[in-house]
Structure formats: structure tokens, C-alpha cells
Amino acid sequence: MGFHTFDAAEADRLSDPTRFRFCSREELLQHLPTGDGTRLLDLGSGSGFYTDELAPHVGRVAALDVQRAMHGSYRDRGMPDNVDPITAEAGSLPFRDGTFDGIVSTMTFHESTTEGSIAEAARVLAEGGRFVAVDWSAA
């Protein structure tokens, strides 16, 4: 990540429920593995808007954002116990190979996509895992 970042001082704006018109909880969950033992990586988690929707359906979520301040905002709102905030860039993921059953990127993939970040996502995704990217469209 790092091409553009959302102003962490405006993080409350990311909690606006009208964001569901772009992608609902159900639309995300239908494409991701779920269950108590499932580990997900949320790339560009921000203040945790979509992370909160995924957390009740899986064992653990790594909420990765390049801005530590976003994690602070998320903690202030109330971070679920099964969410681990990670401050790192998508091109250098601090996880072992095959760590995650699923990876999700909502409205941030256009900011973090490089050959390196795609290779890193593939590296940390378990065999048979799912990568789901939901992003803006010019249409």
C-alpha cells in the first residue's frame, strides 16, 4: 500500500453503513471460507468496517493496514477479540507461506496492487484458498 492513504483523522467516515450499497456482508461471505478454524487476511482493513462483518464467521482475522492510526481508530470503536491488527504493506506481508484460508480486499486493491503485492498475497494464501477483491469501478 502507500500510493494513497485515507486520512486517519477521518476514519469515522469509513463506518458509514451506506458503504454496504457497494458490497454487502452477504456478498463477501458467499465467496469466502468460513468456520471456527478459518483464518482470513483483510488487506487494507482501515477502521475495520468490513472486518467487523467477517469476524463473527471465522476463527481469526488479520486486519492489515499501512497506517497504525487506523488500528487505533478501530480499537477505539471496539475491535473484536478474534481480530489481530497488523501494520504492514501489502508488498511485504509478515506471515508464513500458506497462513490464510482467505484474503479479502475491499475498496483498497487499486491502492496496493503491484506485482510484489500480488505475489505476496499468493504466497500467504493456503492451497485452495480464496482471494476476494471488491473495488471501485469507473462504470
Feature-to-residue mapping (PLM):
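N-terminal, positively charged/glycine-rich alpha-helical extensions of SAM-dependent methyltransferases
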Residues: M1-A11
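Conserved SAM-binding loop and adjacent beta-strand
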Residues: A9-L29, P33
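C-terminal alpha-helical "lid/dimerization" subdomain adjacent to the S-adenosyl-L-methionine
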Residues: D12-R13, T18-R19, R130-A139
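A short glycine-rich, Lys/Arg-flanked "PGG" loop and its adjoining helix->strand segment in the class I
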Residues: G116-R130
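A short acidic, Gly/Pro-enriched loop at the edge of an enzyme's catalytic core
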Residues: G91-G102
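A short SAM/SAH-binding and catalytic strip from SAM-dependent methyltransferases
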Residues: D101-E115
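Class I SAM-dependent methyltransferase SAM/SAH-binding core
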Residues: L41, G46-S92
